[in-house]
Amino acid sequence: MTELYCERKTLADLIAFASVEGLPVGEAAKRLCMSRQGAYKAVKALREAGYLSEGPVIKLTQKGRDALSIVLRNLLRYFDIASIKLVGRVVTGLGEGAFYMSLEGYRRAIERELGFTPYPGTLNIKLEPQSLAHRRYLDGLPGIHIPGFTNGMRTYGAVKAFRARLADVEGAVVMPERTHHPVDVIEFIAPVRVRDVLGLKDGDRVELEVYL
């Protein structure tokens, strides 16, 4: 019983400190309305458990992020939540989205599976740290399968997609099985050029609603 209580308290502390990631412990204590002594004690326990890394600021380890993803998955299942929100800022991509979305193999599959013809390009969004647990949660879901294909010269990998909405634009988040993007960058496709329709520029903060 004591072990179960300790585990629950550790997870509760992890959730709290994840919300102030990047801050020094003293500043985090103020934000969380905790005493400095209590905050340092909790951080010490989380570091010993492997959930936080050593250093001058609060920083989750991969183990800590994985634990949050499990908590999130269980909460979403319990509350029967049908969508999640991803928040980030518009960034310039690598230029690959236009090429891949113009390929007939992907275009036809997206028309078939998602019901729209994609604009030849993707909107790249660099996620805020608070959205990374949601992003990793998507990794564990099947999503909508966009099959890979070959054109006789090259093989193109499969893509996992989730229907999504950005402001008034309906589209999809796409997660290629092969990508050069870091985990904190997500790609959004739509039947229109989203930057033009919504008047977006690099650095603009956006919110994506992703349907599960």
Curated annotation (Swiss-Prot):
Sorted alphabetically, which Pfam families does this protein's record hold?
Answer: CTP-dep_RFKase
Region annotation (Unknown) ranges: 1-83
Q: Name the reaction it catalyses.
A: riboflavin + CTP = CDP + FMN + H(+)
What are this entry's molecular-function GO terms?
magnesium ion binding; nucleotide binding; riboflavin kinase activity
Where CDP binds, per the record, is at 93-98, 192-195
Q: What Enzyme Commission number(s) does the record list for this chain?
A: 2.7.1.161
Instruction: State its role.
Output: Catalyzes the CTP-dependent phosphorylation of riboflavin (vitamin B2) to form flavin mononucleotide (FMN).
Question: Which family would the database say this protein is a member of?
Answer: Belongs to the archaeal riboflavin kinase family.
Write the protein's name.
Answer: Riboflavin kinase
Phylogenetic classification of the source organism: Archaea, Thermoproteota, Thermoprotei, Thermoproteales, Thermoproteaceae
